[in-house]
């Protein structure tokens, strides 16, 4: 039995379940599959548990996503604009 995932079908994936093109709902839990020896398997489809899987290539560089635009409440100061002078008055002494 061959199962093919169709990316064109909307809402075909739920939690650990897929719906095939034929409308069959298939569970993807590990308990539903037999663990097989990879060395003895001939070029066929087989299931390998995640803890046994071997990564054959190093992950590529991770590119940073451009930052989100600043919030309306975040004010960015333009370095070309001079700062306004401080408007604080010195504290008054007791004699004044």
UniProtKB/Swiss-Prot annotation:
Q: Which UniProt keywords apply?
A: Host cell membrane, Host Golgi apparatus, Host membrane, Lipoprotein, Membrane, Myristate, Palmitate, Phosphoprotein, Virion, Virion tegument
Q: What is the effect of changing residue 2 to A?
A: Complete loss of myristoylation and almost complete loss of interaction with UL56
What's noted about post-translational modification?
Myristoylation and palmitoylation (probably on one or more of the nearby cysteines at the N-terminus) enable membrane-binding and Golgi apparatus-specific targeting and are essential for efficient packaging.
- Which parts of this chain are annotated as the region Disordered? 50-96
Membrane topology, as annotated, equals: Lipid-anchor
The annotated regions of Basic and acidic residues compositional bias extend over 65-81
Q: Name one Pfam family in it.
A: UL11
Where would you say this protein principally sits, based on its record? virion
User: Per the record, what is one GO cellular component?
Assistant: membrane
Positions of post-translational Phosphoserine modification: 40
Q: Which Gene Ontology BP terms does the record give?
A: anatomical structure morphogenesis; viral budding from Golgi membrane
| Top-rank taxon | Viruses
**Region of interest: Asp/Glu-rich (acidic):** 37-43
**Residue positions bearing lipid (N-myristoyl glycine):** 2
Where is the protein found, in the record's own terms? Virion tegument; Virion membrane; Host cell membrane; Host Golgi apparatus membrane
Q: What's this protein's function?
A: Plays an important role in the cytoplasmic envelopment of tegument proteins and capsids during the assembly and egress processes. Also participates in viral entry at the fusion step probably by regulating the core fusion machinery.
Q: Subunit notes for this chain?
A: Interacts with cytoplasmic envelopment protein 2; this interaction is essential for the proper localization of each protein to the assembly complex and thus for the production of infectious virus. Interacts with gE (via C-terminus). Interacts with gD (via C-terminus). Interacts with UL56.
Q: Which family does it belong to?
A: Belongs to the herpesviridae cytoplasmic envelopment protein 3 family.
- Record's protein name: Cytoplasmic envelopment protein 3
Q: Which organism is it from?
A: Human herpesvirus 2 (strain HG52) (HHV-2)
